[in-house]
From Swiss-Prot:
GO terms for cellular component: cytoplasm. CDD domains: AAK_NAGK-like (cd04238). This is Acetylglutamate kinase. It is found in: Cytoplasm. It comes from Streptococcus mutans serotype c (strain ATCC 700610 / UA159).
Length: 245
């Protein structure tokens, strides 16, 4: 066991980091766990676009992103959300490093559908060696949800999908998908554990619905690809755990 944990946090969560979150990250790092943080930034991007009077358009839940929009998207992710995340972690005594120019050497991507979504990408390859160098130096690499095409274009990537790709590439012991809900609910209570074999049954019986479906399906595929377990919840310790069996 390498004790690698990949943590995905949303843009809103990264702006409102709790003391418990920061303490747990510090405790894990002190205990020798190897951590990687992937973050989105939808809230910050929307705010920046509104301030610049740029309309927000989404298709199938994905942000349509023009080349001009990417200037605002990258600014929000790197200079606002990522920078704030790094500052807060360092103030808590955590050794970490935000990846900026390094991203082009880590996340290879291709256009999802340029005609429909513009500069939105899907991960094609993770250069895990760059990430491993940070881990070997006892630093937490912080990755924004961005990637680069083979033509050198910066692309906007779904943070859940990027975190999943990173976890699979590193053969992580655990992937934590932090969201704004406590986990998968059944009859009002959080399901503490679901095996990957139970996922389709829970979808078919409408226990898992709407926006939780892609998260759970992604989690099941992640476990099938060799990641030990996936936790979906609103914190680092509790929620719904997805395992192989």
């Amino acid at each position: 066991m390498k004790d690698i944990i990949v943590i995905k946090i949303g843009g809103v969560a990264s702006q409102q980091l709790s003391g418990d979150f920061l303490s747990q990250i510090k405790n894990w790092q002190d205990a020798g766990k190897q951590l990687v943080i992937v973050h989105g930034g939808g809230f910050a991007i929307n705010k920046l676009m509104e301030e610049n009077q740029v309309p927000v358009k989404k298709i199938n839940g994905l942000r349509v992103t023009s080349k001009d929009d990417m200037v605002l998207v990258s600014h929000a992710l790197l200079d606002l959300v990522g920078k704030n995340l790094q500052e807060k972690l360092r103030q808590a005594g955590v050794s970490c490093q935000q990846l900026k120019s390094d991203i082009k050497h880590v996340v290879a991507a291709d256009y999802l559908d340029k005609d429909t979504y513009g500069y939105v990408g899907d991960v094609t390859h993770i250069n895990k060696r760059v990430i491993e160098e940070f881990l070997e130096n006892r630093q937490i690499p912080i990755l924004a949800s961005l990637g680069y095409s083979k033509e050198g274009d910066m692309l906007n990537i779904n943070a859940d999908y990027l975190a999943t790709a990173v976890a699979v590439a590193l053969a992580a012991d655990k992937l934590i998908l932090m969201t704004n809900v406590k986990g998968v609910l059944e009859n009002g209570a959080v399901l503490e554990k679901i095996t990957s074999h139970q996922v389709q049954e829970k979808i078919d019986t409408a226990v898992i619905t709407a926006g939780m479906i892609p998260k759970i399906e992604s989690a099941a595929k992640t476990v099938a690809a060799g990641v030990g377990q996936v936790l979906i919840g609103d914190n680092l310790l509790t929620g719904t755990l997805i395992t192989a069996d």
